[in-house]
Amino acid sequence: MSNVGIIGGGVSGVISAIYASKNGNKVTILEKNNDILKKLLITGSGRCNYFNSDQNIKHYHSKNEEYLNEIITKENIDELCCFYDSIGIVPKIKDGYYYPYSNMAISVKNALVTEVLKSNIKLICNYDVKSVDYKNNEFIINNDKHFDKLIISTGSKAYPKTGSDGFGYSFVKKLGHTINEVKPALVSLCSDDKILNIISGVRANAKISLYHFDELLKEEIGEVQFVKNEVSGICTFNLSYLVTKNNNVRINFMPFIKVEEYDDFMLKNNNKRVKEILNGILNPKLILAIIKRCNINEEKYFYELSKKEKELLKENLISFRIDIKGKGPFDKAQICMGGVPLNEIVIKSMKSKIKKLNWKFYLILINIREYLSN
């Protein structure tokens, strides 16, 4: 039997504790907040989408891609699903997303807490870890707690208000690991474009394309949300890991037709006023923004527009450009990119190649579902 210490009482730390206890170890969770699983409660807007059935390797990005096939395996996926089933979570599945049947994150938290209590795991809350040392084949926390093995699952820098401020990275670095730069991911994109003042609050089904100057980096289709100084929405989040400098997005508000079919579509509406055509496609605020950009009279019939006006209208309907100055901060990011490189980890066990540490995904250099590592 080993004496196992776990720094961090998030989902990774708690599930690790449960498994370690089942394997006959003495387990202690050290949590800096006054309770465990704080971030879990805000997952999925409080509904807790705890699993996604689409585990295609294409959704995972890392410089060490050769390791991903060892992590994302059918065996591991099945084990995770069986675990949630074993603690009484009945899934409600929507578009591949798994939610508890109650549609409430508290149900998942309560199930995990019950399992912790049943497993005789020692839980110490309001415990602020200041130092981690490795001496004489043991880990020493704050010079007063001693463990044979240590699991660091302290969380990234995303949502620091939950206590996840990235403090664990300093311990990892001190123990000999590399820490690649940690950046926000799954986050909105920032812009100074004044047009956002007009379309703030609008949601539109569209195709959004991210460019570096004029080089296309990636495209997504879905709901794009506009707020003051930001472009948001899930499809936008999925592009955010690629944002550096000199980026722009171009939005196609007519993804329901092929670009080469645009002219035929407009020709069919040749005898309609511009505002009548746009009214069937766009939110009124978007109509106002596009009319403003094109500087055309919305009362004109389409056939009355000049060639230049038609070209401007086409450009703004299928390639509405917004220059991007960066992305949102850590307190708005759902996850982070960066951390411990996968080549410093024994993948099958998640153990450190340097010390007898066990890792959880919060500190490993991998981003999940379109938002992976740098």
Predicted region positions:
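Short hydrophobic core segments
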Residues: 5-7, 30, 129, 145-161, ...
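Glycine-rich FAD pyrophosphate-binding loop
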Residues: 21-45
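N-terminal Rossmann-like FAD-binding beta1-loop-alpha1 element of flavoenzymes
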Residues: 2-29
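Short beta-strand to alpha-helix junction loop
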Residues: 68-76, 95-114, 159-164, 302-309
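A conserved short coil-to-beta-strand element within the FAD-binding core of flavoproteins
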Residues: 125-138
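An anion/pyrophosphate-binding glycine-rich loop and adjacent beta-alpha core
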Residues: 34-36, 41-42, 50-57, 178-181, ...
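A glycine-rich dinucleotide-binding beta-alpha-beta segment and adjacent secondary-structure elements
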Residues: 125, 289-370
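Glycine-rich active-site loop/strand segments that organize a redox cofactor
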Residues: 45-94
